[in-house]
Amino acid sequence: MGDSNSSQEAYSDTTSTNASRIADQNQLNLNVDLEKNQTVRKSGSLEALQNAKIHVPKHSDGSPLDYPKLNTYTFVPTTVPPYVLEAQFDKLRLQDKGTVDGNVTDDKNLPKEFKWGQFASTIGCHSAYTRDQNYNPSHKSYDGYSLSSSTSSKNAALREILGDMCSEWGGEERLEGVLHSEIGANLEFNTTEERKEWLQYIEKVKDFYYGDNKKNPESPESVHNKVYKSDWVNELNKEREKWRRLKQRKLQQWRPPLTSLLLDNQYLILGLRIFTGILSCISLALAIKIFQNSRSNNTISESKIGQQPSTIMAICVNAVAIAYIIYIAHDEFAGKPVGLRNPLSKLKLILLDLLFIIFSSANLALAFNTRFDKEWVCTSIRRSNGSTYGYPKIPRICRKQEALSAFLFVALFMWVITFSISIVRVVEKVSSITNRN
């Protein structure tokens, strides 16, 4: 009992001593302020206050209260430990991010007089903190990583997907391309191992672009997984390059047969000539039929209709073209190959195709002009008095004229294709002979 009484007396003496020191410090500050005011009144300006020497008395015991500019708040113990403030700060930061850590201390554990708003502004710069406590060391490694490798890999992936933000996103095409794997539709797998690797690659692409990633990007597990993201993206790019090379290899396998078909196959050029001859025969028949209908008296106009240039030119050009097609088809299929004959004579013969291309183009232009001629039977214009300008409209002749224009257009296209392939064949043979010599 004696010891307890003595400790209580010592505690009361210490408390009274501290209270007296605080009162003395307040009185000291008041005296200093009064002396400053008197100095300003005597001099009449604030500049004299800077040069004036203010006498500040000191306590004799050398306590912190001897220094008037020392903040006494530093020596008052805080009621909330610093680690509680750090935990509450982490909880507030995670709430802003959309996630809450279960290990964060709840508000119920705090004292009633604790107000979060008063301490939130002092976290990290409180006078009771040391220099090493101004940041949370538990997140040091995560923050350092997020500013270096994870951010760079994430930005690289976003730049690859969203290269141009001004262009269209094309999400439907991307989804169709991944889910239906159009690249794999044209691939032929030699072994089951290649098919298995292709399916694994497709699954990785689906998981990368369309996976259900609902984890918190700021959580420790998510940050730890980001370490492998860069390597995983590199592996995915390697597999993508592998399948791109496989597709290129498949295309290279089809290229030699296609080249041989265009340059060496005699049946290809023969088929093109026959098809062009059929179109020329049909065009010639339509032109002759239009010519006959125009010369005969009809019940609508009760007179003969004047002939148009397209009809006469179609008859002349197609009649000569049929004879030329028969001759050159026989020469190319049954004659000597280009390598065993004079290339110049063969080239002169093929250049006649260019002559028919020119006349067919002119004939096509005249056919369209005849179809929309206001003074012919396909377009009739009525005057205000009810009479027609030019010939009345005759549907049966107009239908034949439209068909003639269509067949002339297709025939012109076939002339151009046949001429191009023939020229390429002659040039390729001549260049190969020159290289051998």
UniProtKB/Swiss-Prot annotation:
Region (Disordered): 1-24
InterPro entries: Srf1
Gene Ontology BP terms: lipid catabolic process
Modified residues (Phosphoserine): 45, 167
Alphabetical keyword list: Glycoprotein, Lipid degradation, Lipid metabolism, Membrane, Phosphoprotein, Transmembrane, Transmembrane helix
Factors inducing expression: During S phase of cell cycle.
Chain positions carrying an annotated carbohydrate: 297, 385
Main location: membrane
Extracellular-side segments: 289-308, 370-403
Cytoplasmic side: 1-267, 330-348, 425-437
Transmembrane segments: 268-288, 309-329, 349-369, 404-424
Subcellular localization: Membrane
Membrane topology: Multi-pass membrane protein
Protein's UniProt keywords contain Ligase: no
GO cellular component: cell periphery; fungal-type vacuole; membrane
Main function: Regulator of phospholipase D (SPO14) which is required for SPO14 catalytic activity in mitotic cells. Essential to buffer the toxic effects of C16:0 platelet activating factor.
Subunit record text: Interacts with SPO14.
Name of the featured protein: Regulator of phospholipase D SRF1
Gene source species: Saccharomyces cerevisiae (strain ATCC 204508 / S288c)
Gene, per the UniProt record: SRF1
